[in-house]
Amino acid sequence: AFIRMARRIPHLKLSVMIRPRGGDFLYSDKEFHQMLEEISFAHDCGADCVVAGILTSDGRVDEIRTAELVAAAKEMEFTFHRAFDMTCDTNEALEALVRVGCCRVLTSGGRNTAPEGIKNIHSLVKASAGRIAVMAGSGVNASNVKLLADTGVDAIHFSARNLTESRMTYKNPSISMGGVQGIPEYASIGIDPTMIRNILNQLI
């Protein structure tokens, strides 16, 4: 339902994350087939792009399965997400993604945040040589987005998250139902428009 509702927003380029579970990116046959089904569903909903990633047990891009995912995406763009940063060799991984026909790779340069991996991101941009788009992401804010843009990346990903307090007036102190680690029971993650504007203003 969320995908269909998002598709109704005019002039929006819609990317859909395909990830069957949290944790690592080594998926079982059942999980892989779930990914194929979800890509088909995203296509039927009118998505412009799907975002996914799948690795082998030795920390390399699973080229065979990734090629199947790319083929399943049909005319949709395919972005390989930050599973890329978990590979044993990002330069080798980049070449693998080019071979299987990925449109784009999302990366923090193999570090926890893009600012930390900025030198590696710059190197990846050079190595890509226009064969695949490089998108920098993780830890992006108004104070560092210009530096990341200056690496020559094709795109920048950021979340601009904030916490919105619950409108509940009664808050049961005896039970935790929907709370997860790092997110209070009576709050939800939202988007901060001011943060988005501040980041975009740095790129003008």
Q: What do the predicted segments below correspond to?
A:
Residues 1, 27-29, 62-65, 91-93, ...:
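Short secondary-structure transition/capping segments
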Residues 1-22, 61-82, 116-142, 177-204:
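Alpha-helix-loop-beta-strand connector modules within alpha/beta enzyme cores
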Residues 1-3, 7-63:
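Active-site beta->alpha loop and helix N-cap motifs at the rims of alpha/beta catalytic domains
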Residues 23-41, 85-100, 124-130, 134-136, ...:
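Catalytic cores of alpha/beta
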Residues 31-33, 163-188:
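Short, flexible, glycine-rich and Lys/Arg-enriched loop motifs at helix boundaries
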Residues 31-34, 61, 88-89, 113-116, ...:
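Short secondary-structure boundary/capping elements
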Residues 41-59, 102-115, 151-173:
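Glycine-rich phosphate-binding active-site loops on the catalytic face of alpha/beta enzymes
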Residues 47-103:
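Hydrophobic, well-structured mid-protein blocks that either form specific transmembrane helices
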